[in-house]
């Protein structure tokens, strides 16, 4: 396929994007909005953003969800701008500097919250800056400008959502159904590999792939939840299926680790059962029936606890999977599964990374302000806006440098493209709304094709071109103003890129260490006799942290194995029959406090000291377990955990 070819699957979204732009343009001029450009720009960004992220037409609900986030972010930004202006209108320079700090603060928050919701915070930061900069000449018009901006953005979002509904968006439901079947087959094949106890690298690749697929399934669940209210029951089941899938991975990997020291625990009966190859979910269903009969026949006590737990989790997975596919009423048995343990939310391990993002964004905006004041450039406000937009959006993504490069390419491409529209097309079509709409529809259609291919610069070119062409009411054609706007965008992107290059993000190793210590803390916190604490479901949070670790350190198998071992220790200790008495309960609290000190330690020396204290306390704890005659189900996991912490002490304490 050629570089400029158009694939059939890309046409529908390109038409959808063109329709959203035309609708926003028509409504903006019909209702005599002062700057219909904002409505058109909003419609284009809201529609094209999810397509660029997905690399194709986004699934149903994605555009609506992004639109809602944009509305929330705009209102937060407008309120913040009003507060800043009212408080500091007599000190314009201080007002702009405080607004720069606000943009950095919003970027800091967006780096800590869920990636799906971070868009609203990033948007609220640069919305406030846009308002503060725009009203410099007429500060008394601030409330009117904020209201107009909110109205234009709501119109643009409404047009994007309407266009999405008109062109029958794709439903993700069929993809979810297929993935549920495929995932269960892959889970069974992972257990086969672990029972065989073959090549460790093959097992690592298999469970790593399953962790990624389970995380992807959770993302599909979010999309399905956004799609329609009729999937509420399926959404509840998919939440439980996420935990069950992670449980299956954990039990399989623990089965592999157990065979390193006690291979005799896996009897020949189960080895023969798992030798049967499976290709479909029906094959897995038949095998599970056979296993349940064998477990009933041999008895629970004669069945390895990991296999017993795995078969139970796989059976529950099958039951909920059928419910998701049929979307029928939740049965009493399913309700019992769904009313399981409360899920504990993950605590961010990227606080240092978020602070780096804060300084990058704040310094970029302050540098832009100083450049504007020093040069007295008439388009300094446009340059400031681009700095805020680029840094706010780039900081939330894994590779901010590439986002900046994308914007630089986009603004460079927007210069000749905008020139064509400014000098030739718009002056010759402004007398006819039909021709004006058609000209912008053509722009939206062809850039919509490139956006779906994730062409470098396509997203930036779409936003930058719409931003510099004349779509105001009434239209005025001042070439110097156009050139200033176009150059301001380019300079703003380049200044943001320079700051990102100069302010290095060296938080990767620190984030990795914090993640590993959080795994240790989770394993230690599982040693408790508190009934409420034992019922907490930390598995999704732990695997979310493992997924982040895999993304931060691709190919670092020792880190992945250590993290997985800590997750297995957490699950085993959580279910272990720890003796209930006051002496152990007090010591459990002491262990948790020490583990928390390890995570929060500000220096390597403190961290080593607290980690050494934790190891000493674990040795004392093992002695207490011996005194209180704890069963092997408790003493063996604690001994394995202590051994792992001794072995990887340097990796867990050094920066």
Swiss-Prot record:
Question: How the protein sits in the membrane?
Answer: Multi-pass membrane protein
Periplasmic topological intervals? 1-12, 59-68, 114-120, 173-369, 428-430, 480-481
Q: Which GO terms describe its molecular function?
A: transmembrane transporter activity
Which cellular component terms (GO) are annotated to the entry?
A: plasma membrane
What keywords are annotated for this sequence in UniProt? Cell inner membrane, Cell membrane, Membrane, Transmembrane, Transmembrane helix, Transport
Its main localization is membrane
Record topological domains on the Cytoplasmic side: 34-37, 90-92, 142-151, 391-406, 452-458, 503-655
Entries under HAMAP family matching the protein: AaeB
According to UniProt, the name of this protein is p-hydroxybenzoic acid efflux pump subunit AaeB
Which organism is this entry from? Salmonella paratyphi A (strain ATCC 9150 / SARB42)
Lineage, please?
Bacteria, Pseudomonadati, Pseudomonadota, Gammaproteobacteria, Enterobacterales
Please state the gene responsible for encoding this protein: aaeB
């Amino acid at each position: 396929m050629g570089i400029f070819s158009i694939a059939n699957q890309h046409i529908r979204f390109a038409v959808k994007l063109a329709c959203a732009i035309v609708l926003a343009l028509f409504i903006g001029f019909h209702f005599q909005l002062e700057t219909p450009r904002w409505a058109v720009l909003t419609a284009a960004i809201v529609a094209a953003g999810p397509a660029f992220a997905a690399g194709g037409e986004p699934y149903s609900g994605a555009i609506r969800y992004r639109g809602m986030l944009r509305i929330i972010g705009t209102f937060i930004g407008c309120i913040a701008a009003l507060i800043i202006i009212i408080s500091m209108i007599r000190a314009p320079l201080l007002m702009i500097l405080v607004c720069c700090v606000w943009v950095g603060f919003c970027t800091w928050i967006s780096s800590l919250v869920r990636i799906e919701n971070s868009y609203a915070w990033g948007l609220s930061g640069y919305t406030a800056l846009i308002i503060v900069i725009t009203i410099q000449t007429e500060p008394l018009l601030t409330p009117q400008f904020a209201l107009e901006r909110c109205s234009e953005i709501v119109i643009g979002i409404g047009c994007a959502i309407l266009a999405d509904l008109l062109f029958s968006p794709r439903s993700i439901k069929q993809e979810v159904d297929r993935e549920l079947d495929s995932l269960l087959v892959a889970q069974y094949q992972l257990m086969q590999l672990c029972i065989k106890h073959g090549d460790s690298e093959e097992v690592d690749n298999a469970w790593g792939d399953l962790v990624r697929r389970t995380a992807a399934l959770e993302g599909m669940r979010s999309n399905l939840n956004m799609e329609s209210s009729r999937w509420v029951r399926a959404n509840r089941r998919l939440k439980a299926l996420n935990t069950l899938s992670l449980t299956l991975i954990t039990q399989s990997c623990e089965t592999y680790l157990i065979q390193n020291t006690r291979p005799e625990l896996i009897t020949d009966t189960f080895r023969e059962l798992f030798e049967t190859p499976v290709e479909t979910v029906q094959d897995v269903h038949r095998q599970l029936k056979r296993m349940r009969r064998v477990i009933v026949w041999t008895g629970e006590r004669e069945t390895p606890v990991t296999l017993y737990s795995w078969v139970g989790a796989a059976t529950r997975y099958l039951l909920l999977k059928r419910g998701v596919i049929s979307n029928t009423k939740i049965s009493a048995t399913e309700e019992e599964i769904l009313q399981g343990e409360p899920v504990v939310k993950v605590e961010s391990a990227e606080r240092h990374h978020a602070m780096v993002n804060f300084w990058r964004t704040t310094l970029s905006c302050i540098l832009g302000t100083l450049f504007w004041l020093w040069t007295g450039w008439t388009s300094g406000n446009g340059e400031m806006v681009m700095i805020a937009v680029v840094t706010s959006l780039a900081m939330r993504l894994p590779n901010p440098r590439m986002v900046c490069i994308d914007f630089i390419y986009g603004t460079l491409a927007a210069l000749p493209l905008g020139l064509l529209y400014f000098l030739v097309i718009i002056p010759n079509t402004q007398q006819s709304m039909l021709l004006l709409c058609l000209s912008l529809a053509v722009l939206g259609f062809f850039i919509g094709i490139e956006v779906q291919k994730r062409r470098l610069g396509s997203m930036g070119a779409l936003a930058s071109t719409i931003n510099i062409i004349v779509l105001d009411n009434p239209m005025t054609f001042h070439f110097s103003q156009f050139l200033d706007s176009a150059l301001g965008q380019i300079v703003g992107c380049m200044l943001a890129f320079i700051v990102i290059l100069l302010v290095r993000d060296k938080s990767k190793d620190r984030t990795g260490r914090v993640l590993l210590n959080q795994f240790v803390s989770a394993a230690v916190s599982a040693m408790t006799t508190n009934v409420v604490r034992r019922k907490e479901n930390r598995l999704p949070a732990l695997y979310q942290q493992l997924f982040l670790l895999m993304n931060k350190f691709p190919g670092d198998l020792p880190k992945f194995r250590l993290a997985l071992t800590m997750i297995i220790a957490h699950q085993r200790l959580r279910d272990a029959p720890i003796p209930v008495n006051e002496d152990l309960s007090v010591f459990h609290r002491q262990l948790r406090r020490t583990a928390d000190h390890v995570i929060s330690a500000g220096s390597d020396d403190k961290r080593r000291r607290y980690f050494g204290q934790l190891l000493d306390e674990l040795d004392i704890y093992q002695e207490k377990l011996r005194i209180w005659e704890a069963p092997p189900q408790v003493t063996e996991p604690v001994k394995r955990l202590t051994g792992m912490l001794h072995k990887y002490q340097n990796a867990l304490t050094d920066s």
